[in-house]
Amino acid sequence: MMSASRLAGTLIPAMAFLSCVRPESWEPCVVPNITYQCMELNFYKIPDNLPFSTKNLDLSFNPLRHLGSYSFFSFPELQVLDLSRCEIQTIEDGAYQSLSHLSTLILTGNPIQNLALGAFSGLSSLQKLVAVETNLASLENFPIGHLKTLKELNVAHNLIQSFKLPEYFSNLTNLEHLDLSSNKIQSIYCKDLQVLHQMPLLNLSLDLSLNAMNFIQPGAFKEIRLHKLTLRNSFDSLNVMKTCIQGLAGLEVHHLVLGEFRNEKNLEKFDTSALEGLCNLTIEEFRLAYLDYYLDDIIDLFNCLANVSSFSLVSVTIKSVKDFSYNFGWQHLELVNCKFGQFPTLELKSLKRLTFTANKGGNAFSEVDLPSLEFLDLSRNGLSFKGCCSQSDFGTTSLKYLDLSFNDVITMGSNFLGLEQLEHLDFQHSNLKQMSEFSVFLSLRNLIYLDISHTHTRVAFNGIFNGLSSLKVLKMAGNSFQENFLPDIFTELRNLTFLDLSQCQLEQLSPTAFNSLSSLQVLNMSHNNFFSLDTFPYKCLNSLQVLDYSLNHIMTSKKQELQHFPSSLAFLNLTQNDFACTCEHQSFLQWIKDQRQLLVEVERMECATPSDKQGMPVLSLNITCQMNKTVIGVSVFSVLVVSVVAVLVYKFYFHLMLLAGCIKYGRGENTYDAFVIYSSQDEDWVRNELVKNLEEGVPTFQLCLHYRDFIPGVAIAANIIHEGFHKSRKVIVVVSQHFIQSRWCIFEYEIAQTWQFLSSRAGIIFIVLQKVEKTLLRQQVELYRLLSRNTYLEWEDSVLGRHIFWRRLRKALLDGKSWNPEGTVGTG
């Protein structure tokens, strides 16, 4: 089943992937002129052939080795620069000068040995600096004190031994995240945090994970306020952990994270006594992660954290929990991927959010008493419910969000009495029982989102969705309907905007199934068993934008139905269906071709039958269909008549074309001053002499040339007549021996004679390019007679001859045309 976000992502056009239109072949653009990814291209220097407008540049894995001053001067608009693993050893003063807009700089994995004091000068807008694995040994010598806009500094996986925060940290007033994980820090002293007493950074999140901590001086964190402190895999033993946590006394932290990582284990054993020091901290939110040790009880841990607002356990094994009693002031409790002996007893008066997901043990749900609860996530636990769901199950009437997805058998025994405030309800991939026996959701008039996908539900009761008057999203994929027929079950869902009916084995649907869904925008009918596209049921969906009918067995559509798609429809998916590419369905196949702008991935729509056309794209299909005898008889008679007419017209075809053109264009303006007829053997003279002198000289003339002005895909004869003669004021005939021997040239010349006869304004100018043998010339009687009786121009390649030639030719072309002093000639 395609999720809503994926469906929308495939159907709403995003930015097209474009390649650079530049002479270089290396740059694979993501967004031309803005984003360039140039990884692993073996660059030894910064490329200088990228546009000034570049904003995002990835040069990672190139052997740059050295960054000199003004290395990025050509990219003043740069915002993100990635120089990961470029073997950079030296960064000189002003290397990033002029990058006043740069917000992110990544230097990961560079063995930096020489870092100038002014290396980061000019970065007046830098917010994120990543210097992971850069051989950094101390924060003291890191020249970043002037980066007042810096919000995130990541120097993890380095050689830093001292936690002392330099004096320049008082300038970094916007710093929100400092990552010192996986360094060599072992001890923290009071003097190390002196700068935080002088200039508190109240929003600072500090990560000290994966440091082999063995000592935190008592009082080092006294009266220090942090937004977040993370200490995971930071202690080698239980005693060290206990001592260091006691050293945190006096710290006020919004979010404290302790524990280990999934694949990183330092502690051999663990018990809650190591956390006794937490009673001396002021904590708002607490998380304990990946302590996969068998804890007998964690009630002592709860006592020190009774007043936190959020308590979270991730991947913790707990042998037993007596209860979560009213004594705790938690508002959010999260238990994820933990192991319990049984489902815990929950009686928490102030709790508003409970996340209990992917846990093991205690498969039977026990009633809880959570009077303030608004958000409840019980997904992925394999839980069983008997008589779900009502206020008595959860001990609250304030619940707005309930997720029971990916559980075991859930028997519906109540229609959510006391849970009328629910807005989000998710049952997907749980096994629902008794869903079609009564109106389960009758009380949920505030529900906006409902997911019952893949819940083994068989819809046999038309009132299954009664009461859901506010519902906007309904997902019920992977279920089934009685007789594989979709009845009128959506009559009360007038506000529905998204409906997923995929994988429901549907074969038919009621013509009025969707009549009430005037607000529906997205409808997924994919992975069903429809054999024809019946569009009639969608005529009332005036807001429908996306319709997915992919992966059905559609062969065709009902002949009268194609007109009923709503005008609002923007995306229709018919891919991977069983299209029958036969004459019987020719109108439907033609409709597909006509609607290619509407259809999603239309190029993937292929024929399934007949066998000789299987796999053929529908768009490339060209069917020659047989006709009945009457049609054949009429066609034969028509062909005979047309043949007789064609024989009579054949000899006069081009004359008629010219006559029609003269009538059509006779009173209009000409596009060209002259159409040039010449042999391809003389093309060099035409390009270098005729075109250059007439189109670039004074006055200028516009010539029609077949290699430049004829329309591709149109017959040569049609181009000669329509583009050459009809749109030109005169004709220039370049006579040479090659011309006389060319059948095309003689054809053009004969058409020119007819054109001159039909058009009163037409004129033919002859240019004899080279001496022509009279015996050869006499083979073309009409041409010989015309040259004998009319004045023509002869080309003479001398200074005086060229001057006279061009003066006479321009005079002939100017005949009947206006010319202004600026040297331009109107085409008339």
UniProtKB/Swiss-Prot annotation:
Residues 577-627 form the LRRCT domain. Keywords: Cell membrane, Cell projection, Disulfide bond, Endosome, Glycoprotein, Immunity, Inflammatory response, Innate immunity, Leucine-rich repeat, Membrane, NAD, Receptor, Repeat, Signal, Transmembrane, Transmembrane helix, Ubl conjugation. Glycans are attached at N33, N171, N203, N280, N307, N495, N524, N573, N622, N628. Residues 1-23 form the signal peptide. Phosphorylated on tyrosine residues by LYN after binding lipopolysaccharide. Residues 24-629 are extracellular. The TIR domain mediates interaction with NOX4. Transmembrane receptor that functions as a pattern recognition receptor recognizing pathogen- and damage-associated molecular patterns (PAMPs and DAMPs) to induce innate immune responses via downstream signaling pathways. At the plasma membrane, cooperates with LY96 to mediate the innate immune response to bacterial lipopolysaccharide (LPS). Also involved in LPS-independent inflammatory responses triggered by free fatty acids, such as palmitate, and Ni(2+). Mechanistically, acts via MYD88, TIRAP and TRAF6, leading to NF-kappa-B activation, cytokine secretion and the inflammatory response. PANTHER family: TOLL-LIKE RECEPTOR, TOLL-LIKE RECEPTOR 4. This is Toll-like receptor 4.
